[in-house]
Swiss-Prot record:
A Pfam entry, by short name: Ribosomal_TL5_C
Organism: Xanthomonas campestris pv. campestris (strain ATCC 33913 / DSM 3586 / NCPPB 528 / LMG 568 / P 25)
Family (UniProt): Belongs to the bacterial ribosomal protein bL25 family. CTC subfamily.
Organism placement in taxonomy: Bacteria, Pseudomonadati, Pseudomonadota, Gammaproteobacteria, Lysobacterales
Cross-referenced CDD domains: Ribosomal_L25_TL5_CTC
Oligomer status and interactors: Part of the 50S ribosomal subunit; part of the 5S rRNA/L5/L18/L25 subcomplex. Contacts the 5S rRNA. Binds to the 5S rRNA independently of L5 and L18.
GO BP: translation
Protein's recorded name: Large ribosomal subunit protein bL25
Gene3D superfamilies: Ribosomal protein L25, beta domain (2.170.120.20), Ribosomal Protein L25, Chain P (2.40.240.10)
Protein role: This is one of the proteins that binds to the 5S RNA in the ribosome where it forms part of the central protuberance.
Length: 209
């Protein structure tokens, strides 16, 4: 069961650039909820509440319960506009989700036990995480807050591909249906000397030009 987080919102009466500017001056974020069979609804949120929430990973990858005076709608964050240099959120888009319809979402990858793996124990090995998140398709109830990748058995020279990730029940990676060339590397454990040699070769090629 996907974990949800509740966020209290209010309906927004005034719209337009002037109204949005006044809301921001008052510490309120203009936002919109769309999708499903319902009409889009303009809402507003407390900036301080959202500023704290957006510092957490779950804000971007979990089902959110928008509570409008007791009317709760389940949504996903789809877009968040930030001020270019101020600590200010300008606008947020939320998309409604239906319990019976699959959704597409980006889910963070959490890598565990790297330090105790054969590759992690070697001072001569460089372990790189090529991806930090993955796009998945699933029903809302199956959406994971994150996907854990156990690296405890990672060997020197090993490569973990997208197809090797253990997924929770009901979760799919649509990228894998597009062909073998989309089965990209997620983790690479490369011997440090190999990397140093590659750098040296590139430098030599540059000098020769």
């Amino acid at each position: 069961m996907a974990k949800t987080h509740e966020i209290k919102v209010e309906r927004r009466a005034d719209e337009g650039k002037g109204a949005s500017r006044r809301l921001r001056h008052a510490g309120v974020i203009p936002a919109i909820v769309y999708g499903g069979e319902l009409e889009p609804v303009s809402i507003q949120l407390n900036h301080e509440q959202i500023w704290l929430a957006q510092q957490n990973e779950w804000f971007y990858s979990s089902i959110l319960d928008l509570n409008l005076n007791g009317d709760v709608q389940q949504v996903l964050l789809r877009d968040m506009q930030r001020h270019p240099f101020k600590q200010l959120i300008m606008h947020i888009d939320f998309q409604r989700v239906s319990a019976n319809e699959k959704l597409s979402a980006s889910v963070p990858l959490h890598f565990i036990n790297e330090a105790i793996s054969p590759a992690g124990k070697s001072s001569e090995v460089v372990v790189t995480h090529e991806l930090n998140e993955v796009q998945v398709v699933c029903l809302p109830k199956d959406l994971p807050e994150f996907i854990e990748i156990d690296l405890s058995t990672l060997e020197v020279g090993a490569v973990i591909h997208l197809s090797e990730i253990t997924l929770p029940a009901g979760v799919e990676i649509p990228e894998l249906k597009l062909g073998k060339e989309h089965d990209v590397a997620v983790v690479i454990a490369k011997h440090g000397q190999v990397e140093a040699d590659d750098v040296a070769d590139e430098a030599a090629e540059g000098d020769a030009k």
